[in-house]
């Protein structure tokens, strides 16, 4: 089967935003206008096609990023709808990794919200070209100019308005196309028909000002255009579009559009702009990978004739076909029924069937081409972040980094008979979600599950019940504390067992030092003259790393330290790897006494929005939770407080906030950094961990 859409006519885009900015509704409208859905599904009716898990339909939020394909003006647009809730950042992270461009949706009243910032930073990290769509222009308090200002000041972006709204709130009628300088006014409820009209006189001056700024931004992308602009010549509309496209793809600027997806206004112009400004797979740099044997770096450009390479970015268990592996093809072609190599794990896999997904119904296809996103059935060993490639041309593509969980709870089945079923269910859910971990506590024998927040774990427990029919009891949430060293010290680790016969002998001197936050663990070997033979060095490192997992003061992982092995000794007969491994772990225990080990706790960036009359109450409450107020601002008939608060103080906060604000306050939080726990609290935690 030949390609239906050429590579330059393919777009892989994500739709991302803060929770409730209207992402899923926007995607629903795209599917409606591109002819993929005959009836529009509403999120608040629980009928949106992109939200296909039962929990999503009940809660009206998107949890898994459903991938779907749509067609518009001779282009194929593959869309990934990502969740906006902070607990599901993993979904956003993995979507961004396989996208070529994104549309960030803003709430015209809320502007830039905390999760928008988080998602924006994630997209910065992956260098994803973006456009902004200011949605909900029809609601009370909608303010396009405020949003434009915040995108610049809070996100540090270079926003360029290419549209301007006509009216706002219940007077919102359409928008001005600033390139053509024409008004687009909607005449029917479904937004399928629009008229082009003259720009209303009261908006003309502002539109001309924004058009000037747009032309200047376009001219900056190209030297020839800049000369033309400086010499006072008019740039043609095609020149402006081409320059804006270049600036968008180079991440130098971000086109800004507006509309109201719910009221069906602005979605078709947005689709035109996605095609006009966001990159196709051939417009962006080729993906880099390494050769498994030599570790040399190679490029895999988007080309059907190249060797097959793809990245698996999501695993899902489907009630009808079993395990689905979503993957993005970077180069080459794949036919169903063929074998591929999972180069990350070194295993051969057979691709049984290939499905093109449309939210939750699927179409079977026989071939996928470079630049496509599809789902495979039949892969047994492949997990998120693995590379799939041609067996004859192995390559390992850059994978993705996932954040460590910040919260844990103990879980047990309500009936002992379900113990095994629960274990199977949890391990399947952990396969799907790299930020969800499950382990058994060695001391208590309890099953501990960890994730990104209370909602994340709630959904996991809910899925256990629905998908695996296991009812469970859940303990109180526990914070994922960390430990680190404050000071540097040189310590000795010596393990000697010599009582006749073959003994054990391992002896090292190690310098431990604290590192900057987030640097993890570093190990350096400074042994000279072979006082410790080279083959024992990895054993010392392994001994230190294994002991770090269980910490030195309260059983929490030790992070951000450097260990340098500087001296030691060995015995010709009695030394072995095991002895040096033990010596490494003894050195760490010794360091705990001299390096001033301390506890660290996750600090959350919290934003609370409420009517002004509750300000005092809410601030007092945040202060009592060891919160630091960072700032306050008025936002569309409400007050917003920004604060840094330890996660341990935020459990159950939603209930308390509801009662303090009579249900009118909302909050969101994302992890910001780790900080040392105050001494009196640390003492309590250490006592508890020792069972005192």
UniProtKB/Swiss-Prot annotation:
Q: Which residues are recorded as binding GTP? A: 17-24, 81-85, 135-138
Name the Pfam families on file.
EF-G_D2, EFG_C, EFG_III, EFG_IV, GTP_EFTU
Listed A to Z, the keywords are: Cytoplasm, Elongation factor, GTP-binding, Nucleotide-binding, Protein biosynthesis
What are the GO BP annotations of this UniProt entry?
A: ribosome disassembly
Cite the Gene3D superfamilies for this sequence.
3.30.230.10, 3.30.70.240, Elongation Factor G (Translational Gtpase), domain 3 (3.30.70.870), P-loop containing nucleotide triphosphate hydrolases (3.40.50.300), Translation factors (2.40.30.10)
Subcellular localization is given as:
Cytoplasm
Instruction: Enumerate the InterPro entries for this protein.
Output: EF-G-like_DII (IPR053905), EFG_II (IPR041095), EFG_III (IPR009022), EFG_III/V (IPR035647), EFG_IV (IPR047872), EFG_V (IPR035649), EFG_V-like (IPR000640), G_TR_CS (IPR031157)
Q: Name one GO molecular function term.
A: translation elongation factor activity
Q: What does this protein do?
A: Catalyzes the GTP-dependent ribosomal translocation step during translation elongation. During this step, the ribosome changes from the pre-translocational (PRE) to the post-translocational (POST) state as the newly formed A-site-bound peptidyl-tRNA and P-site-bound deacylated tRNA move to the P and E sites, respectively. Catalyzes the coordinated movement of the two tRNA molecules, the mRNA and conformational changes in the ribosome.
Its family remark reads: Belongs to the TRAFAC class translation factor GTPase superfamily. Classic translation factor GTPase family. EF-G/EF-2 subfamily.
HAMAP family hit by this protein = EF_G_EF_2_B
Q: What is this protein called?
A: Elongation factor G
């Amino acid at each position: 089967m030949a390609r239906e859409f050429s590579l330059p006519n393919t777009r892989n885009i994500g739709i991302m935003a803060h929770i409730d900015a209207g992402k899923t509704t926007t995607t629903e409208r795209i599917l409606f206008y591109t002819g993929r859905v005959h009836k529009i599904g509403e999120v608040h009716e629980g009928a949106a096609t992109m939200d296909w898990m039962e929990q999503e339909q009940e809660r009206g939020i998107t949890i898994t990023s459903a991938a779907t394909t749509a067609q518009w003006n001779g282009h194929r647009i593959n869309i990934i709808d990502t969740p906006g809730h902070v607990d599901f950042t993993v979904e956003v992270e993995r979507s961004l990794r396989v996208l070529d461009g994104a549309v960030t949706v803003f709430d015209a009243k809320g502007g830039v919200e905390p999760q928008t910032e988080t998602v924006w930073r994630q997209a910065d990290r992956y260098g994803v070209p973006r456009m902004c769509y200011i949605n909900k222009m029809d609601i009370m308090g909608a303010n396009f100019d405020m949003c434009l200002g915040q995108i610049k000041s809070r996100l540090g972006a270079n926003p360029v308005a290419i549209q301007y709204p006509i009216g706002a709130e219940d007077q919102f009628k359409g928008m001005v196309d600033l390139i053509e300088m024409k008004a687009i006014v909607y005449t029917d409820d479904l937004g399928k028909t629009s008229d082009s009209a003259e720009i209303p006189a009261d908006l003309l001056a502002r539109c001309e000002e924004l058009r000037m700024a747009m032309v200047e931004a376009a001219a900056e992308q190209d030297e020839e255009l800049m000369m033309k602009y400086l010499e006072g010549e008019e740039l043609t509309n095609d020149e402006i579009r081409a320059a804006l496209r270049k600036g968008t793809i180079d991440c130098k600027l971000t086109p800004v559009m507006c509309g109201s997806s719910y009221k069906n206004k602005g979605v078709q112009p947005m689709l035109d702009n996605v095609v006009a400004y966001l990159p196709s797979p051939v417009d962006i740099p080729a993906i880099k990978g390494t050769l498994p044997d030599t570790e040399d770096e190679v490029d895999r450009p988007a080309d059907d004739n190249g060797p097959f390479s793809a990245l698996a970015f999501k695993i899902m268990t489907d009630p009808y076909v079993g395990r689905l592996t979503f993957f993005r093809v970077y180069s080459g072609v794949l036919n169903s029924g063929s074998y591929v190599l999972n180069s990350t794990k070194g295993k051969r896999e057979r691709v049984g069937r290939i499905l093109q997904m449309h939210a939750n119904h699927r179409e079977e296809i026989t071939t996928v081409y470079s630049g496509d996103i599809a789902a495979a059935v039949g892969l047994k060993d492949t997990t998120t972040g693995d590379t799939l490639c041609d067996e004859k041309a192995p390559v390992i593509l850059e994978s993705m980094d996932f954040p460590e969980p910040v919260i844990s709870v103990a879980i047990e089945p309500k009936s002992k008979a379900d113990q095994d079923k629960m274990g199977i269910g949890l391990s399947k859910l952990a396969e799907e979600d790299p930020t969800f971990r499950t382990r058994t506590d060695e001391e208590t024998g309890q099953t501990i599950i960890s994730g990104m927040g209370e909602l994340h774990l709630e959904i996991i427990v809910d899925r256990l019940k629905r998908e695996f029919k296991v009812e469970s009891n859940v303990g109180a949430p526990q914070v994922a504390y960390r430990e680190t060293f404050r000071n540097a010290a040189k310590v000795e680790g010596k393990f000697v067992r010599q009582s006749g016969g073959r003994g054990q002998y391992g002896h090292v001197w190690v310098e431990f030092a604290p590192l900057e936050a987030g640097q993890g663990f570093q190990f350096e070997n400074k042994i000279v003259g072979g006082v410790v033979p080279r083959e024992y060095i990895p054993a010392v490192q392994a001994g230190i790393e294994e002991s770090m997992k269980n910490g030195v003061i309260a059983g929490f992982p030790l992070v951000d330290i450097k260990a340098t092995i500087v001296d030691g000794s060995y015995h010709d007969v009695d030394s072995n790897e095991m002895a040096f491994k033990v010596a490494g772990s003894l050195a760490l225990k010794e360091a705990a006494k001299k390096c001033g080990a301390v506890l660290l706790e996750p600090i959350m960036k919290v934003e609370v929005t409420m009517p002004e009359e509750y300000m005092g109450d809410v601030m007092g409450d945040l202060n009592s939770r060891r919160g630091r107020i960072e700032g306050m601002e008025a936002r569309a008939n409400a007050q917003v407080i920004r604060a840094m608060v330890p996660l341990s103080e935020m459990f159950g906060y939603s209930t308390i906030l509801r009662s303090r604000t009579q249900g009118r306050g909302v909050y969101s939080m994302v992890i910001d950094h780790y900080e040392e726990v105050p001494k009196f609290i640390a003492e309590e935690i250490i006592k508890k961990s020792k069972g005192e």
